[in-house]
């Protein structure tokens, strides 16, 4: 939340309850814990101080579970988007609109591809999540025009492998997500075909 870590923090009890639950229950019930998955909305408004606070909380969680901090895996959500930046940038808004207005997923992928290979500003669509990326890089979960998803591989029994894939569901997310819309008519996310992994024998994919 926006108030996390402030004098009016209303979620402190919830965070303490999570840590207590890990200490008393999770450590005795869960065996061989390999990591923590964070499915987006790490921040409230994509601001650095929010990520600093989140990093400290995740550090406490990893310490309780006895795992390394590098074993945190995260993806961005719409609250990880710096909407204040987008409001000031016609360039970002126009790029997002072009993708959203595509008639087919192939057209959306083509438009997205044009923007991330633009020699003048290939990171345009990733500027709104720059603070997320600064936070996520320490976990190996940063994404940009050169790496639009991240993957991590784990070995399982019987020659099987588990692969995590971190998706980006907020490519076109902005302050317009809920403009004049109710929950039934919320703005649709765009997840391109280039984020969908190909079939691999003896591999189980988990998309986050």
Describe the predicted segments one by one.
Residues 3-7, 40-45, 117-136, 176-178:
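A generic short-segment signal for beta-strand/edge and adjacent turn/coil regions
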Residues 26-32, 146-208:
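His/acidic metal-ligating clusters that form di-metal
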Residues 38, 74, 206-208:
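Structural beta-sheet core signal
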Residues 40-41, 77, 167:
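Active-site glycine-centered loops adjacent to acidic/histidine catalytic or metal-binding residues
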Residues 48-51, 122-125, 186:
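Generic detection of long, well-ordered alpha-helical segments
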Residues 52-60, 90-97, 183-186:
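Amphipathic alpha-helical scaffolding segments
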